[in-house]
Amino acid sequence: LSMSDSISVMHNGSIIQTATPEQLYEAPASRYVADFIGESNLFNGTVRQMQGDSVVLRTEQGLELTSPLTPTGKALSADVAGCIAVRPELISIASANADMTREVKLQGHVEDRIYLGNSTEYRVRTQAFGVVCVRVPRQQDHGANAFEHGAAVSVGWDHANGLAMAL
């Protein structure tokens, strides 16, 4: 993200967030901003309950996810449409039979493996959410740690790795 010191993101002719590149990536104000800079796994749903600075969201698939509010997400309230964004580099991947100690765990199959030089991106087809994108640093993705197309895997993340925000 070699950009300006401050960036304004516009949508439909209005500025929706002005921040540093790091703030835009780490604390997007909305789903649009989360998708604007970098890639995110975006899970839409309805806010079921607010718990302090966290949100319990019932996804469109009927699952409940808990995540902290993005610093600009204070406008969310119960029964409002919302979204939880999880960046690909914050999601773990392991063989399907591995003991993964993450708060959210999904089973799936590797649909695509993309070598990016400094990392490898896996696109994992899950029954719960469709395709989930996972990015693994190069030093962790070699030999026995690499997963080929069709491999049965588990993907997972902790609640703190997501950010709840307005659509």
Predicted regions located by residue number:
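Non-catalytic connector elements of ABC transporters
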Residues: 40, 49-167
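Internal alpha/beta loop-helix hairpins
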Residues: 1-63
